[in-house]
Amino acid sequence: MKENELKNEKSVDVLSFKQLESQKIVLPQDLFRSSFTWFCYEIYKSLAFRIWMLLWLPLSVWWKLSNNCIYPLIVSLLVLFLGPIFVLVICGLSRKRSLSKQLIQFCKEITENTPSSDPHDWEVVAANLNSYLYENNVWNTKYFFFNAMVCQEAFRTTLLEPFSLKKDKAAKVKSFKDSVPYIEEALGVYFTEVEKQWKLFNTEKSWSPVGLEDAKLPKEAYRFKLTWFLKRISNIFMLIPFLNFLCCIYVSRGMCLLLRTLYLGWILFMLVQGFQNIRVLIMSMEHKMQFLSTIINEQESGANGWDEIARKMNRYLFEKKAWKNEEFFFDGIDCEWFFNHFFYRVLSAKKSMWPLPLNVELWPYIKEAQLSRSEVLLV
């Protein structure tokens, strides 16, 4: 009798395991070797790519019938080099157009599945939309979204930021028409989940540094900020821009001194801007919440307060493996500039700052962080 019960329990366990396996969410990232192979597959299946391939048929006939090969050669070279560019542009516009026509369905999926700012919450939304777009002949493959992060980014650039930047009802209706009530409901659900995440983050998931008294800011280790910056260029993300800068130095060797100085100065300025942008791009939503929480809870005022915030965040980002060392911020001044430039400044943004995020879901907490710094100064 006991053996039968054990067998039944095992069979139930196997069935439940199989049910869980069948319910497992499958996204293109699980099927393709990489995002590049997925991208190539999407291009291959696109109408623009097929048209580009068909263009070679009349060109081949022209080559065979023409007595003068110069004109066929010129056209062939144009098709060869400009064709792929047009294919990429058309495919990008086609994706944007296809998604913009399905905003209501996008909103329904968000309302039903209640995702937060955590990318994992968007897996169900991405999988459902992939199936819906393919089954309703909106898209020609089952793999519109490569993974949850791509779906979340599409939500940010298609719904969250454009809708939030519209200040009045008339502007929203003009841009989004019948989708407005669905978007409002979806954003309401999303903001509610983000608020839950923020409250949970500040209580159960709160982080406190250990041994921070031994931590030093880069300003204490480097004589000049330029030295610190040049060391940061060794980061793999900045390798290509830095090599490009060296190439510009070589190319500009024939210019007069004034033009060369202005040209190289502008290139170096763009390199610095690129480095600053990379810092905010590598921060996840959790990192940003920790940054704002650290600012709000810091008791020190003025420059000392920002130094403490910089020291804590340097340790935090290093422990979370978001940065390779404890030198994310040079000092408190750099930390304050980072907050004002990438967080507080976006509150008055009137248009998208792509590729930089507007962090719309963090606007209430950004205001709170700014207010907390002002109150500390007053005290």
Curated annotation (Swiss-Prot):
The keyword Transcription regulation does not apply. Keywords: Membrane, Transmembrane, Transmembrane helix. It is found in: Membrane. GO terms for biological process: intracellular sodium ion homeostasis; protein transport to vacuole involved in ubiquitin-dependent protein catabolic process via the multivesicular body sorting pathway. Belongs to the DUP/COS family. It is a multi-pass membrane protein. InterPro entries: DUP/COS (IPR001142). It holds the Pfam family DUP. GO terms for cellular component: endosome; fungal-type vacuole; plasma membrane. Residues 94-254 are extracellular. Residues 1-72, 276-379 are cytoplasmic. The chain crosses the membrane at residues 73-93, 255-275. This is Protein COS3.
